[in-house]
Amino acid sequence: MSATQDYIVADIGLADFGRKEIAIAETEMPGLMACREEFGASKPLKGARITGSLHMTIQTAVLIETLVALGAEVRWASCNIFSTQDHAAAAIAASGVPVFAVKGETLEEYWTYTDKIFQWADGGVSNMILDDGGDATMYILLGARAEAGENILTNPGSEEEEILFAQIKKRLAATPGWFTRQRDAIKGVTEETTTGVNRLYQLQAKGLLPFPAINVNDSVTKSKFDNKYGCKESLVDGIRRGTDVMMAGKVAVVCGYGDVGKGSAASLSGAGARVKVTEVDPICALQAAMDGYEVVQLEDVVSSADIFITTTGNKDVIRIEHMRAMKDMAIVGNIGHFDNEIQVSALRNLKWTNVKPQVDLIEFPKGNRIILLSEGRLLNLGNATGHPSFVMSASFSNQVLAQIELFTKGEQYKNEVYVLPKQLDEKVARLHLAKLGAKLTELSEEQASYIGVKQQGPFKAEHYRY
């Protein structure tokens, strides 16, 4: 990066390729294009300085350009070291938006880039965060706590935490007071995924959330579509691109049966695999059983299954003792947000053979091998290109509406975690119906009165489960 070049991408020469794919994606993202049409003239995000930490894909490029069209200034990094699509990053950088994202970046680079998305050229600060997984939010809040004298940077629990702490210490030394200034300027954060939402609720419970947050993940048009239908298409895509293994007839184990697990099980089942599910929640376990899947304990199938996928958002779901017992050439991957669902750190002292980017063959002392995809990180983005544009349009439309809500009405919110109101959820769904040729039935005034709703909605109570 030169002194005048405010971006870091793999190859700026890929910008034209990226621009062509962005143009195609726009035709598949009716929600975002409708947001541009509705809000483009009024520019409700004028004055917003958005720090974005979310997978730098073609679909995210359409989101970024929608935010810019609505008046925002944006700085962007990926929220995963393997998920960037380099041509997408190049196209956004070439358009003048600062982006710091390279597929296969190191952890040190990842946290450096997270720092850079808060570094505005004029020395100013961000006033909004758009997050996926919570790393950008956590970076600022941990740094501010360290500035306040809390002893929180001394005992890292992992390699990544060690690198994160080092980056925070570097910034503390270079610019004292920087984290506190950043934190105090933030009007709000909108969070994309389950893992990041869990972090926000934990902060709220401890009284450590210093600004309002909108939980985009639990909008129905995100969790029941992106998490389920997105995974249904992208999981098998990632496994196929990574391994070229035929899934028909194979035994696949899906760890977790939440929305992501449901989509993942459907993905593998649709490819012809015989799917088994592990679950800790009796309700989800019963759902899996009644959907036709055998609900098992991992220990009972670990030596016989062919494919293992984690979807839980928890840690140590597949441990070293499980992988040691797997059959030769078992495939192991994760589609939850972070890389600690699989105990990858416990594999580091074994023999690794890199087959190709994001595909590693790991050999145990007894001679059995496993194929590990994306080093235990999101395989659908590491080994493939993530969810299709159409389903991401629904998720990202929620993000745009949430950013507008907090930026324009932030003072009306307490420092708590909120979800978007039902009418906006229904609006996002409505924006995507025409693309699929779907036509809504309309209630008569008498029918609406009979069930106690307005003719144009919302049609369900807040407690309704879709």
Swiss-Prot record:
GO terms for biological process, alphabetical: L-homocysteine biosynthetic process; one-carbon metabolic process; S-adenosylmethionine cycle
Residues holding NAD(+): 193-195, 227, 256-261, 279, 314, 335-337, 380
EC number of this enzyme: 3.13.2.1
Cofactor dependence: NAD(+)
The keyword GTP-binding is assigned to this record: no
PANTHER family: ADENOSYLHOMOCYSTEINASE
Main function: May play a key role in the regulation of the intracellular concentration of adenosylhomocysteine.
Protein name: Adenosylhomocysteinase
